[in-house]
Amino acid sequence: MNAIHVTVYGQIQGVGYRSWIKDSADKLNVKGWARNASDGSVELFLQADIDILNNLLSLCWEGPNLSDVDDVLTQESQVNESIISFEIH
């Protein structure tokens, strides 16, 4: 299992991005969380096998219909075994 911290930039707050990414993560069985940041970005913590993470990262660029993603930055992170689902914070 791998873990990454992701920051998504663009017109992504107030358009259902976190709910959309949760639905996508749940379908792929990705564990982690999503939260709005004060700078208008959305922060994600994702953990799953690397192929699944890469699939979800591709989806991060799409977002829901009303979103407009400008950038997706990733950073490797430590797996957190206590996270057993995907939550919106």
Over which residues does each language-model region extend?
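Intrinsically disordered, low-complexity, mixed-charge
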Residues: M1-H89
